[in-house]
Swiss-Prot record:
Part of the 30S ribosomal subunit. Contacts protein S5. The interaction surface between S4 and S5 is involved in control of translational fidelity. Keywords: Ribonucleoprotein, Ribosomal protein, RNA-binding, rRNA-binding. One of its GO terms (cellular component) is small ribosomal subunit. This is Small ribosomal subunit protein uS4. The gene is rpsD. GO terms for molecular function: rRNA binding; structural constituent of ribosome.
Length: 208
């Protein structure tokens, strides 16, 4: 499956919630879900009855799109979460949250996960003092993410850092805005993920 390159707002309307795929626009009245709160397409406003399987599938698609992960990789995350101790659904969300691109977004260096992924791939960050340009790198407690010196004058990064006050930084992360540095204080718990996700539906889908 190829990466989706169409209109981001269309995905939000399809999942009937804000996925925050377009950065600051998602916090304004220009957000598509606020203007047209129904699925895209000719029959979008009809909202037909959805089966249990359809509900489970939509939940999985929603989470995939939030984190920008393709199906094969998402399935791998689920299988890894299933092997871990604890609750499979919570393990899955923890693995997704600990991706480097998501941590960069959560710290406020980018206004969206898509933007964070681009910044990571273009070598703007170091992880524990070493080059890190793979968005899917799994971070652990104690890891330190630093924006490189040459990248600290990039306007969009500084604008995102200024806006992070409104969005807030999760409890499991610590941001040193002046030093352009973030630290993973501890692994994210389920209560640290405030998005309306029903991870048990994903577990049920993959367990069939």
């Amino acid at each position: 499956m190829a990466r989706y390159t169409g209109p981001s707002c269309r995905l939000c309307r399809r999942e009937n919630m804000e996925l925050f795929l377009k950065g600051e626009r998602c916090y304004t009245d220009k957000c598509a879900i606020k203007r047209r709160n129904y699925p895209p397409g000719q029959h979008g406003q009809g909202r037909p009855k959805v089966s249990n399987y359809g509900i489970q599938l939509r939940e999985k698609q929603k989470v995939r799109r939030i984190y920008g992960v393709l199906e094969k990789q998402f399935r791998s995350y689920f299988e890894e979460a299933d092997r871990m101790r604890g609750v499979t659904g919570e393990n899955l969300l923890s693995l997704l949250e600990r991706r480097l691109d998501n941590v960069v977004y959560r710290l406020g260096f980018a206004s969206s996960r898509t933007e964070a992924r681009i910044l990571v791939r273009h070598n703007h960050f170091t992880l524990n003092g070493r080059k890190a340009n793979i968005p899917s790198i799994q971070l652990k407690a104690g890891d330190v993410v630093v924006l490189k010196e040459k990248s600290r004058k990039i306007a969009c990064i500084n604008e995102s850092l200024d806006a992070v006050v409104r969005r807030g930084t999760p409890q499991w992360l610590e941001l040193d805005k002046e030093g352009y540095k973030g630290v993973v204080k501890l692994l994210p718990a389920r209560e640290d993920i405030a998005m309306p996700i029903q991870e048990q539906l994903i577990v049920e889908l993959y367990s069939k």
